[in-house]
C-alpha cells in the first residue's frame, strides 16, 4: 500500500503539515481495514513521520533515497497494489503505470481514466460528451468574462489546491497574470448550491455507492480550502447520486476500485465538479458509515466477478481535516 505524501513522495522536500495529516488519515484508515483481511501488508513511510500501525512491514524513506526505486522494489514483492497519490504532475498515472509494468494487480483505476480525470478540461469534455451535467471549463484564451463570480483552478490539481475565487472577472484575471498561472490554470464560473461528494466503487462500467457526503469548503483571502464534511450528510440524494455515478462509470469504463466524485447539488440537480480516480479523505469515515469493511468491498468487487454487493448502513459520520 503506497500513500504518496506520507510514504516518502516528498522525502527530499519540505513536508507540508496539512498534506501529511490528510494523507495519514487515509493511510491509517486503509491499513486498519486491510489488516482485518487475510493479507500481509507492506508500505513505506517518510523518515520524518512515525511508522504506521497495522502493517506487516514498513520501509523507511530518507531524504537521500530514491523513493521511486523503493516503490518499484516493493511493488515487485507484492501480488496486489493499492495506490493513494495525487493526480498532479501525473504522479498517480506514473505509479499506476509502474505497477502495471511489474505485473501487479492494481486495486484502482486504469491509465485511460486516470489521464482524463486528472485534467479538469479533459474531464469537462468527457462529461459533456456523455451528456452529464458539469461546470463549463475555459482557458484564459476563450473565457467569456461575463459579470459573475469566477474560479481559477490548476488544470491538473487535486481538491482545493491553489484554487482562487473572485467576485469579478478583472480581479481574477489580475490574479492569474500576477501569479503566472496562464498556462497552469483553467477557469470555471461559480456554481451555486451545496458542495457534496459521492464515494463509490466501480468496475467495468458499473458503480456501487458507499456514501453520499457533504463537503465543508472555506474561502479565505480568495483561496479555497477543504475542511472535511459529513459522511452520508446527503443520503437523501442517494438515488440521484447513484444515477450520476453509473453515468460516469459508463462514460469512463476503466474507472475501477474506489472513486470519489465531487458534485454541487442545486435545487435537486446534481452537477459534477470533478472525478477523483483514487481514495479520497471521505474514506476515513466509511467503515463506521457503512457498517462494512470498505477495503474488503473494493477488493472483492475487483477480484470476484460474481460478488454480490451487500446492503450497507447509511450512518452519518462527521470528519475534519
What are these regions (language model features)?
Residues 1-19:
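Nucleotide-activated donor-dependent transferases that construct or modify glycoconjugates
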Residues 14-34:
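Short catalytic helix/loop segments, enriched in acidic residues and glycine
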